[in-house]
């Protein structure tokens, strides 16, 4: 492929690419950063400037960019087989990966249904739960419980179980209705508690009330375990997830865990559900499954869920769902190489020290005048900016303070993305101690510059 100069690439980009979650009028008036290389925790633009990737290529990168072992696995697979369908066939890489996923997943999740992104992985889970109850002779169980501030993707089924009006409101007429429960947001408690210490898990009490009032009609509950991602990296109080599992058991509701963002070591455990010792009935995976290299997703289910779909063909119990690139051998080979690196690098064993260091560095930010909250779960962190710390008054969204802080961070060699007034910290798990220092120091300087305090 020939090399093109930066300005040519910028011009072609503005002429031809429609970027996600982007106001293109502003984009067309900007000078986009063109990334051409990656190395470890860094991305490098067409002019040679290096940026610490503080968002792990949008919450996907695990072992760093351009990791040799993964590159070699991908190259080797390209020379063997690029793609083969799972409709009527199987392939060796998909088989081996499914076995390994079942071995490391929360106990009981033993069946793997492949797709190609997080939204579809969630939709697969929703459709499984819906059809499951029909096969069980309970078609009245057809509704879903979702949470405020939830985000499960951008396809219509995933949007239906989401809860972010900024993203989803315009599509409301296209969506199926869900039953929405309050999600815990300890900094801005929906139950009016002043401090996390005063938390009495009223969100669980309200969830149980909702389940009781819709007894016999709920097929499944969809939840982001431990952390609500796009809602603002909102960390759930300890015990909430386990409480949700207990309520689902009590009311005969399938629990669907969306681990698309939090899976594969991000919370300090291989899977977030493992932090509270629970097994969902269905679990959606993507993003980190290939360490940020390839589009691949998987929806894991228990034997009980799977068995409900077994029968003679004429019984029409087949799960009629699939995607062209389901179980793609290239993606599966990369995912296997990533799992190998988890073991050879002893990555999970190294995370506690990194998590602690990040926690210590973030403590300094809470003293800043316009930092209202700093929250963290594993290698996920968020800094919520406010106009007034005492009242928690947020900055007006029109001021775009979060965007301005992230743009300023680029001048300090750090690439970040905001969620409104919330600055997200989500680096590759392979980040070093020195790079954690660099990231947080750059963020602190940027907050000072933009907010003046």
Swiss-Prot record:
Catalyzes the transfer of the alpha-amino group from S-adenosyl-L-methionine (SAM) to 7-keto-8-aminopelargonic acid (KAPA) to form 7,8-diaminopelargonic acid (DAPA). It is the only aminotransferase known to utilize SAM as an amino donor. GO terms for biological process: biotin biosynthetic process. PANTHER family: ADENOSYLMETHIONINE-8-AMINO-7-OXONONANOATE AMINOTRANSFERASE. Pathway: Cofactor biosynthesis; biotin biosynthesis; 7,8-diaminononanoate from 8-amino-7-oxononanoate (SAM route): step 1/1. Its cofactor is pyridoxal 5'-phosphate. Homodimer. It comes from Geobacter sulfurreducens (strain ATCC 51573 / DSM 12127 / PCA). NCBIfam families: bioA (TIGR00508). Substrate binds at residues 151, 287, 322, 417. Keywords: Aminotransferase, Biotin biosynthesis, Cytoplasm, Pyridoxal phosphate, S-adenosyl-L-methionine, Transferase. This is Adenosylmethionine-8-amino-7-oxononanoate aminotransferase. GO terms for molecular function: adenosylmethionine-8-amino-7-oxononanoate transaminase activity; pyridoxal phosphate binding. Pyridoxal 5'-phosphate binds at residues 118-119, 258. Belongs to the class-III pyridoxal-phosphate-dependent aminotransferase family. BioA subfamily. One of its GO terms (cellular component) is cytoplasm. The record marks 21 as: Participates in the substrate recognition with KAPA and in a stacking interaction with the adenine ring of SAM. It is an enzyme of class 2 (transferase). The lineage of its organism: Bacteria, Pseudomonadati, Thermodesulfobacteriota, Desulfuromonadia, Geobacterales. It comes from the Bacteria.
